[in-house]
Amino acid sequence: MEMQQNCSISCFWETQPLGCVKISCIFYHSKPRNINGLFLPPSSNITLQKESQEGIPLQTQSQEPLKPQENISRPIHHPLVLKTNFEEEEEVDEQNDASSLWTKTPEEIEEKRAIKEMCYKSGEYYRFHTPPDILSSKSMAPTAEKELEKPLENGSELQEGDSLTVPTKLSQYERQGEIKTSLHGKPKTDIAAFENGGGDCYVPQRVIFLGVDESEALTEEKEITISKCSNTKDNKDSPHPKRSLTTRLVPTTHVLNATENISMKCREDPSSMNDVQPVKKPHFKGVKKRKWIYDEPKNFPDSGMRRAVQTPSPQNKMSYHRNNKNRNAENASYIHVQRDAVRTVALNAPPHSRPMHGSYNKVHVNKEPKPNLSPDKYMSTSYNDSAWRKRIPFSKTYSKSGKIYPEPRRNGSK
């Protein structure tokens, strides 16, 4: 269109003396031009008309094919636009709901809420759920924990003397303390009763713990049954009931320290032998030490006695035997316990702390005859000594250990 309009405008350079020099000048030229030997005739109106006529059909031809294209491309219905951003749709819906709240009645609002709740419930139904077994176990777990906590708070359902009753819901530190303190009750079995004093006439005693971890105590302690080597042979001919005696091997320093405390208390106050008190050493860590204490006679020997446990005088034993046979049987069982306890001290004592011919031999032993007690009970001294040597290779025996319990004779002579 600009070319057609420009062709109707006369060229400015045509009025100049040199004329229009441009070959491709689009303006109207009334005069011919000669540009570098090229002759250009003047532009006429016919050409303008032709050009204008040619331009019009071109436009019509270009517009005609557009019409069928428009008819084809135009859809009958409005196009469906899909929105991928769902948040915007929700916001628009909320705005529409907010705008329509003013016009809706409360019944319609309640209906919409009910529909939304139903949709939410249906969505919850189709979601992933844990199986009911897990849910039931989760619900049962807190109830079981509560039931377990009740007897722990009351302390009534815990059995007396049962060392295996340990509360489950405790920390590791409290659990260790509970295991240690649970052994303070009365034992049920015969073996435990025999260790605590034996039979009906035992003194209730407490087990002493001196602050050792359970792992260390388990590694250090080795349980040895001596019933095969000592008690079975002794009890073959005796009418007393057979009872297996279990002893524990502990380090020598702990046994000696515990027995030294007992001997010091006996020296200061002889009546303290009948009292049951826990022995504690604050400056060392030890293992639990069971001590066997019985009713001692009031007449003690000379002050040179350093023994932890004394042998009872035979006169009192004979009176016990005459008065009560059961009491005499228990005292006879005490003899084995005391002899084994003293032997642990004598065998495990280090040489530099105890002299070879020390005060262990300074024991007041009444050598009067004992007709009612079988002498076979004293025969197990040498047999037990050899058994201790076999089972405890690191222990050192004394040459005069056999003189602690000499065999009494019928006539009373040595």
Curated annotation (Swiss-Prot):
One of its GO terms (biological process) is poly(A)+ mRNA export from nucleus. It holds the Pfam family zf-CCCH_3. Residues 136-168, 298-322, 350-382 are annotated as: Disordered. This is Uncharacterized protein C12orf50 homolog. It comes from Macaca fascicularis (Crab-eating macaque).
